[in-house]
UniProtKB/Swiss-Prot annotation:
It comes from Conus marmoreus (Marble cone). The cysteine framework is XII (C-C-C-C-CC-C-C). The keyword Signal applies. Contains 4 disulfide bonds. The lineage of its organism: Eukaryota, Metazoa, Spiralia, Lophotrochozoa, Mollusca. Belongs to the conotoxin I2 superfamily. This is Conotoxin Gla-MrII. Expressed by the venom duct.
Length: 94
């Protein structure tokens, strides 16, 4: 019985360490694989990441402030270009 308990504890420890290592590794990157529900709230597991709203078609994702600002600027630029294209005379748009 003692052997079974120690094996279970060992496996549980390995799983817990793996989860901690995953969070630590993802905190070093600008993007996290973590999705969130409250844009601009600090509810992400990494203290350096915030919940960022990318677009209506994508889920909000945890990332650094700088990456979030550049992603949102890119989305606005893309939308602006689409609107400008739609206003073009029809013969130029083809």
């Amino acid at each position: 019985m003692f052997g079974h308990t120690s094996v279970s504890f060992l496996l549980l420890s390995i799983v817990a360490l793996g989860m901690v290592a995953t969070v630590i590794c993802s905190c070093d990157s600008e993007f996290s694989s973590e999705f969130c529900e409250q844009p601009e709230e600090r509810i992400c597991s990494c203290s350096t990441h915030v919940c960022c709203h990318l677009s209506s078609s994508k889920r909000d994702q945890c990332m650094t402030w700088n990456r979030c600002l550049s992603a949102q600027t890119g989305n606005r630029r893309s939308t602006h270009m689409q609107k400008r294209f739609l206003r073009m005379p029809r013969d130029l748009a083809d």
